[in-house]
């Protein structure tokens, strides 16, 4: 791409995308250059000029240092995109557990340049990061105490406003440059003894699996296959990795239960409907799942079992990996 094709607006969108929508994994570190890659979901603001929209954006950066400045070449989806100069470039390391870490890019203003050559991008290189599993999420979350919950707002204005992620009882807090997912998780002993170990048992996931419709054409209840690998191992779109929080069924009010096998995790009584509820007046985060969902048998209401569920806050490093791997969560958080 020629230098002249980049407007000031283009450069601003590109800089924002590289900093705020990409999780970077280091591919190589050499004396004269370094290379990083990111596998990102489609962006609401940044796109490739004159190219069909892609739901996965595989970005590769090769960086060279010159005096007090940095020069970098960028490729997107295997195609050289451009070369740029900046006075500030910093990769901040974020560690989740042992074996899973990534970098967040900090950039100064960027200017198009021409290095006179296009470096070879290591497009086939695969990261060896540990996957995001339910165990990893349990290891990297904290129980939310009543004092913390009272400081968080689920309805109305406030400094600590939670953004709903789509699923029942799942939110994200933007705190400075950090993201924190808040959700209700199945008690760990129940997860170990009676639940699928490949799926993180959030309240959002359990309720979704109970009430999702069976239509193959439903855009809500069927996997949209537009996630990306949270740890960057796979280039291209993947199915929901069962560790996301975007689960939203086509029906939320008095929805019929189509999968009764999970009822015992929510209620001791027999129920055949779930009613998902949303606060109508200003409210802080409630630690009672009955504030967000209720069970019914016909028209008779039944309270859900709070004892099976723990309110948790997922670490900032892990929350960012999860949110940015999902186009739905990323968009609602960035809006």
UniProtKB/Swiss-Prot annotation:
Q: Which Pfam families match?
A: Herpes_UL16
Query: Which controlled-vocabulary keywords does the entry list?
Result: Host cytoplasm, Host nucleus, Late protein, Virion, Virion tegument
One of the record's GO cellular component terms: host cell nucleus
Tell me the domain of life: Viruses
- Fetch the InterPro entries from UniProt: Herpes_UL16/UL94 (IPR004286)
Give the subcellular location: Virion tegument; Host cytoplasm; Host nucleus
Does the entry feature the keyword Isomerase, yes or no? Answer: no
Question: What family does the Swiss-Prot or TrEMBL record give for this protein?
Answer: Belongs to the herpesviridae cytoplasmic envelopment protein 2 family.
* Job description of the protein: Plays a critical role in cytoplasmic virus egress. Participates in the final step of tegumentation and envelope acquisition within the host cytoplasm by directly interacting with the capsid. Upon virion binding to target cell, a signaling cascade is triggered to disrupt the interaction with the capsid, thereby preparing capsid uncoating.
Q: Which HAMAP family match?
A: HSV_CEP2 (MF_04039)
Oligomer and partners? Interacts with cytoplasmic envelopment protein 3 and with the capsid.
Protein name, entry field: Cytoplasmic envelopment protein 2
Supply the source organism for this entry: Human herpesvirus 6A (strain Uganda-1102)
Question: What is this protein's gene name?
Answer: U65
